[in-house]
From Swiss-Prot:
Part of the 30S ribosomal subunit. NCBIfam families: arch_S11P, PRK09607.1. Residues 107-129 are annotated as: Disordered. It comes from Methanoculleus marisnigri (strain ATCC 35101 / DSM 1498 / JR1). Keywords: Ribonucleoprotein, Ribosomal protein, RNA-binding, rRNA-binding. The gene is rps11. One of its GO terms (biological process) is translation. GO terms for cellular component: ribonucleoprotein complex; ribosome. One of its GO terms (molecular function) is rRNA binding. The keyword Ion transport does not apply. This is Small ribosomal subunit protein uS11. Signal peptide: none annotated. HAMAP family: Ribosomal_uS11. SUPFAM superfamilies: Translational machinery components. Pfam families: Ribosomal_S11.
Amino acid sequence: MAEEKWGIAHIFASFNNTIITVTDLSGAETVTKSSGGMVVKQDRNESSPYAAMQMAIQVAQNARDKGITGVHVKVRAPGRGKQRSPGPGAQAAIRALARAGMRIGRIEDVTPVPHDSIRGKGGRRGRRV
């Protein structure tokens, strides 16, 4: 059996878009990447699970062509002052990567979470409707 080569799949999943980037283990060299707008026509479908599946298949194929057989997954949501839960594409992307033949190592959530709070959008008096 051939030597396994691992990479890191960075999945950024918001409610507006999903972006998948595969890098080497150091994270410095990008192997392949894809976003929702590259696989679907309508803007509203960029964050959908279907778009995430198509992206993951495309990314897995490109990564395998470059010799990467397994990935550690880092899932990220917008975080900070925005939502801390990943969008609908995150789970679908991980499942599709596994089905496309990539070995999945560790799955980690790397959403930036503030330890205090930051000034909310809209300022001190809030959004005036």
